Regions:
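Gly/Gly-Pro- and Ser/Thr-rich, intrinsically disordered tail segments characteristic of DNA damage-repair
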Residues: 1-228
Length: 228
């Protein structure tokens, strides 16, 4: 494989920020509940067995093995009675022993199923955008979706982290941690950050492939991390 000279490539300091389970987290915070420890899903037509799951908390995903998109009838419990659904379990190849049934029913009883409130999500998103503007100019902030976007911190990195003994990679990590902290303090929402001292694409790849699985919820992919 030929050698690629990345020193000729443009470089920027990128923080690609994703709000963890955004809709579900907003609903948890509005109820004074911990967004990572509460079993909650946002469902259209929440009183109906055909309701569409629009978002779910990390705990909901862990317990019921469901992603953000699905139907109420795919759950291992009946949405109305909160009783174990043997039919759904067998259809999906899930266990039906008494311990598993009790486990699912116990969690089903405390699981919150709530309707979507887009006005709330937009309001929290605007609050997060204002936090971003504390660290970069509007021209350096690029919304990707309602719960995700990146900030080009190239021009502001040394201003916020002036320590000359630190590398730009270390500075980017410190500043990204500060952004995470501010989002959590002001909104109660946890965020994940894919960082790159190269370009937004590598920041996005770091976010999707590594940051979501690290204790700090941050990861950095730059040119030196790309195979030649």
């Amino acid at each position: 494989m030929g050698y690629f000279d990345y020193s000729r490539e443009p470089k920027s300091d990128i923080a690609f920020v994703d709000m963890k389970s955004f809709y579900a987290s907003v609903e948890c915070v509005k109820r004074g509940l911990h967004p990572l420890k509460t079993s909650l899903c946002v469902m259209s037509r929440a009183d109906n067995s055909t309701g569409l799951i629009l978002a779910s908390s990390p705990m909901f995903k862990k317990i019921f093995g469901k992603s953000n998109v699905g139907r109420a009838y795919d759950l291992p419990f009946d949405i109305k009675t909160r009783k174990f659904s043997y039919y759904n379990a067998r259809k999906q190849g899930l266990p039906t022993d008494s311990d598993y049934v009790r486990y699912i029913e116990d969690w089903a009883q405390v699981t919150l199923v709530v309707p979507p409130r887009m006005d709330e999500y937009i309001a929290v998103n605007m609050e997060i955008q204002r936090i971003f503007q504390n660290y970069g100019s509007p021209d350096d902030i690029y919304p990707y979706s309602i719960d995700e976007g990146f900030i080009d911190l190239t021009s502001s990195l040394n201003y916020f982290i002036p320590d000359k003994s630190l590398s730009r990679k270390d500075k980017l990590d410190l500043l990204s941690a500060r952004i995470q902290r501010d989002i959590w303090r002001q909104t109660g929402i946890y965020s994940t950050v894919g960082m790159s001292n190269a370009n937004p694409l590598l920041g996005k790849l770091a976010l999707d492939n590594e940051a979501k699985h690290t204790p700090t919820m941050r990861a950095n992919w730059s040119y030196q991390d790309v195979e030649e």
